[in-house]
């Protein structure tokens, strides 16, 4: 009798396990949802792209420079381009990558703004724009970032590169590795500050990709690049921003200028108006006036032709989705990929609607960050953009020990 009872219990456990694998656990059949909401607004073709930046039709603009590119920051859509794939020196715009790696080191906990940055003989000997660092001097990382962003100091950039990478050559390797990760296929860095060096080349498109990355993931850079004047050494060293658009253009937020004999006069400028964020890249202008005039022309075109419209709200936005074959039963959903606004062409008219698509259930295993659904934005029947809905946590596949534990809980009430 006891043997038959034990066999029955084993059979029950096996059946419970198989049932759980086949049909899931707490959440049952899950859901299928397509949610829509319509709103009358302007519309235009807009495609979410990362990291490639596709070009839109645009009128010819009078720009005195070798290369130019205008993108909308949130979507990455190219609004205007001129010789955007031509490789050329980019001068101190190089420092955008130096700043990106530095802010990422801060985010990772390897550095703080109070970290002291020593000055080496190598950093001391940098030419070009500088704050005249002396070997053995120390400044906080916050002070060095101000020197880099406001005065474009080459000596400060190299000192920070040595702190982050151990040496400037090692840091340059990190710069090139990060560029490759971002899809900057035409870029090769040879130094951390942008001084003319053979083979130190990039393109307007790659500069836009790099600029978009730092503005999106390290927006604190604007607290530095938006400073007009500052000082170091208890007021003895004055810093004045090289980006004159800060005083001349409404909505300018900052970023980086650059000038060398090989690169000409350059800028990657960021600006925001009414929620629309633009990045204008100008390379190889013959003069500072031409650089700022070209950037102004690009930004004027962008703000005049486009707008940022609110993403259409969805009447229902489920917080979780059922999972079959997992002890978790369901996973919470992550909607963080959805932007607050969508790029639209001014005056185009039309109906903007959003559509959320999710499966009935998910099959275990599910990994955190896995795409499990999408939000599509349409103008009429024309698809404008798609954004991923992701799983917010892992959901491991149910194992026999998991099934035994769940059965024990159900029989005894003891977890």
Locate predicted features:
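Active-site-adjacent loops and short helices of periplasmic peptidoglycan-processing enzymes
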Residues: 2-6, 26-218
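Intrinsically disordered, low-complexity polar segments enriched in Ser/Thr/Pro and acidic
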Residues: 23, 27, 35-36, 45, ...
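Domain-terminus/edge residues, biased toward the C-terminal soluble/receptor-binding domains
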Residues: 4, 184-188, 196-201, 205-415
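Sec-dependent N-terminal signal peptides of Gram-positive bacterial secreted proteins and lipoproteins
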Residues: 4-27
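An N-terminal domain-start capping segment
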Residues: 14-18, 28-30, 393, 404-408
